[in-house]
Amino acid sequence: MKFEFRTLVLISLAVVVVLSGCSQSPSSGGVPEYSGSKVYSAPTLYSQLIGVPTEGVSVKAYTVENANAKDILSWYKEKLSDYEIVNEMSVVQMTTPQGSAEWGAILFKKGDKGVGIWAMSGSGVEGGGAVYFIVEGPIDKLTGESGEAGGAGEQLPASDQASGEEPVKRYPGSVMLSYYKDTSNPLEVSIGIDYGTEDSAEKVAHWYKQELQAEGWVLESESSDDSSIDLAFSRGKEYIDIYIIEPYEGFLTRKLTSTTGRRGCHLTTWSVERSRWRGIPAQLCWNT
């Protein structure tokens, strides 16, 4: 089963409307809302970049003050205990030029009904609070599959599944899985690309360190844990941040985001695909 998690930090949010009535009253689909939630009218760009499914499902977004992603997801695991957990992205912390953020997601099902919860929080989120999404609908709509048992048939595509401008040289042998470009702001251009490779995160990181430093980039910092590697480069007023996650099972994916403009970098995205896929999220930002 392929299940995508994508997280976006520091995007401009739409006007927030205070939710009327009890904050923990059931939503129209029967899923309760976290205490203190306020309705959030999410822009299309936001939903696209964090990987929230929108076709054939109901999507509701909320903001919460004085809450974090871990608390929200734990709360839903308790409240939806009569559902089966299909997939879970444990809360992880990331550091971005705009601040830190923690995020995670859980996919539940009961029969043919699916419920997905995406949550993120931290200084990288506007207001420093938390944002979460409730997605309800047929389970196959949430997973992007037609109900067959997943796993055995999942493999890296043999050729690119998308095309577009590539601001950074791609890792050898990798396949482009998706491409996104936003030119709505004339001062900023945002490009998001997902790639896939069967190589290890260590091999990918080693290649990028060699290639980028040969092109004049300075490795400002490098950190790692049991599941990820984070590389930060700079060259004059430009910088690149590449966050690499170890393969969960099967192949890796990498997310590149490019934001350009006189005001510098304002948009940060990353992605992680779970089940047989794990992500190599990366941020590429030029300050002019």
Swiss-Prot record:
PROSITE patterns: PROKAR_LIPOPROTEIN (PS51257)
Keyword Signal among UniProt keywords: yes
Listed name of the protein: Uncharacterized protein AF_1845
Keywords per UniProt: Signal
Signal peptide (residue range): 1-27
Region annotation (Disordered) ranges: 144-167
